[in-house]
Amino acid sequence: MQTPLIDLRNIRKSYGGGDSPQVDVLRGIDLSIHAGEFVAIVGASGSGKSTLMNILGCLDRPTSGEYLFAGENVAHLDSDELAWLRREAFGFVFQGYHLIPSASAQENVEMPAIYAGTPTAERHTRAAALLERLGLASRSGNRPHQLSGGQQQRVSIARALMNGGHIILADEPTGALDSHSGAEVMALLDELASQGHVVILITHDREVAARAKRIIEIRDGEIISDTATSDPSVQLSANAGALQAVDLRQRLADGSEPTGAWKGELLEAIQAAWRVMWINRFRTALTLLGIIIGVASVVVMLAVGEGSKRQVMAQMGAFGSNIIYLSGYSPNPRTPEGIVTLDDVAALANLPQVKRIMAVNGAKAGVRFGNADYMSYVGGNDTNFPEIFNWPVAQGSYFSEADESSAAAVAVIGHKVREKLLKDVANPIGQYILIENVPFQVVGVLSEKGASSGDSDSDDRIAVPYSAASIRLFGDHNPQYVAIAAADASRVKQTEQEIDELMLRMHGGKRDFELTNNAAMIQAEARTQNTLSLMLGAIAAISLLVGGIGVMNIMLMTVRERTREIGIRMATGARQRDILRQFLTEAVMLSVVGGLAGIGVALIIGGILILSEVAVAFSLAAVLGAFACALVTGVIFGFMPARKAARLDPVTALTSE
């Protein structure tokens, strides 16, 4: 005797239990179905026929009993193998059609083949042929809402046949149709049965059930009659035993992981994600806004921080990285600072590693020209100033050694002082300004340097001969500090050590002086700027985090709204990982689009800031980093909703509203 294709032994299905009362839906079902049979399972509403169909189609598991498919116990199959069985053996035709609303008729039909790993061209050809066979060739691009009920049911039948549809499970296929459409659907099922497909028809209508060759009546979860209207063997055809002729376990081993399927599934996931995003454009835009703001904030903040850093570094570096500063120092704030003398300067000038040295005696002082008053830094120094600080004169000339020797009342003004006091004077050279009410003649204007660090503006200064500053302005011959240019920029540290040793000898071993160098100051400023940039980036990253929470929120809502779609995908053969991939792809797509848009917005904002003369320096690493963060955010915050979707029970998902 031929082994049944489907063999149910004492199948029971119960719900509830524990704190709630147990409800027995199926009570000891024994049923065998052979290849090629056209079976109708008929019963009133609540009789358990739909539950039986779900178990037959591997959408649900029985509470107890054995389900043998082609001789293999279905209870021993894992979720992926059950998905393979649904994909390769079964084709579902539901009363409610269960088509994915956002997909076209052809895309709905192709879905089982996507999960089977069928090549794209072959998939398109087969789907088109099935739709043409069912009279829907002209409607292949229409979405479900653009089709009539009968047309939607025919699309559902085409989908059931996409992977062969060896076993067609039709649950009330005519229940939502008018009589004409219902007759067309039943004619199709008759045709499929005559071609050797196993057709299992679930219905409450005895007239519809009469079309089958075998009628099984179920009541209160029990089979009360099983009547064959003709010999099932008459219906067998060449392909009727296709599944039975091979070892199911081998088929599962070979086919539960379709070769190359992931490529088609990924492409379909991307296309589906884009469709969903486009259909829900307004909601998508609001979700993207969080990602866009987050990415744009990170990129712009880091660009502003980097621009500020480069500007400050360039301005500080413009003074030379080989400069060492010497000044008086006291370790105890209650005692006066040590004094650096001109004798110290003379001794240091003889060190072989010292290229140039200059004493500076300066302070803030009131400056007047005409009726304009201004406070600026006035520094007494010598003719080494332009060389030590690499600071040429833009107009006029620097004062000479003769001016220094004679304590001449001459001054070289900075660019900012020129703008503040002599802006309306065509040629400031030769003009007289009052410094602390002492007249000084302007002999030169320094070139523009800009801010050296923080709020300090290097152009806000006036240079006068050291002797003139000491005698005419401050009355103190000792320098405020000493600027020393090392002969070798790569040996600044060693030069500083030599200066330190000499000063200790000259001051009797007393460390009442302090040494700093531009290189160390630049490094310290760089660290400060880096910290500032990180702070700005961290603040901006909070926006990105908020955007990620928005993605998770919208994906959780999407999973809830599309629960039935998840059930449809599972019924057509999607594994848990396929569902996970689908919804994770959607989350990542949101992040990718939001990330790219955020970068675009950041570049626009950066352009506006540059036009506003704000220092901005975009970094490829920062841009890519922000985009990567958006991507990771999408993966992290999209994983939980996607995982929730993947863990849904197929039956629960299909019956959700």
Swiss-Prot record:
Q: What does this protein do?
A: Part of the tripartite efflux system PvdRT-OpmQ required for the secretion into the extracellular milieu of the siderophore pyoverdine (PVD), which is involved in iron acquisition. This subunit binds PVD and drives its secretion by hydrolyzing ATP. The system is responsible for export of newly synthesized PVD after the final steps of biosynthesis have taken place in the periplasm.
Q: How does the record describe its quaternary structure? A: Part of the tripartite efflux system PvdRT-OpmQ, which is composed of an inner membrane component with both ATPase and permease domains, PvdT, a periplasmic membrane fusion protein, PvdR, and an outer membrane component, OpmQ.
- What keyword terms does UniProt attach to this protein? ATP-binding, Cell inner membrane, Cell membrane, Membrane, Nucleotide-binding, Translocase, Transmembrane, Transmembrane helix, Transport
Check the record and name the Gene3D superfamilies matching this protein.
P-loop containing nucleotide triphosphate hydrolases
PANTHER family (UniProt xref): MACROLIDE EXPORT ATP-BINDING_PERMEASE PROTEIN MACB, MEMBRANE COMPONENT OF TRANSPORTER-RELATED
One GO cellular component from the entry? plasma membrane
User: Which SUPFAM superfamilies did the record assign?
Assistant: P-loop containing nucleoside triphosphate hydrolases
**Where in the numbering of this chain does the ABC transporter domain appear?**
6-245
Its protein name is Pyoverdine export ATP-binding/permease protein PvdT
**Which molecular-function annotations from GO does this UniProt entry contain?**
ATP binding; ATP hydrolysis activity; transmembrane transporter activity
Q: Which gene encodes it?
A: pvdT
Q: What is its main location?
A: membrane
Where does the protein end up? Answer: Cell inner membrane
Q: How does it sit in the membrane?
A: Multi-pass membrane protein
Annotated transmembrane regions: 285-305, 532-552, 590-610, 620-640
Where is ATP bound in this sequence? 43-50
Q: Which family does it belong to?
A: Belongs to the ABC transporter superfamily. Macrolide exporter (TC 3.A.1.122) family.
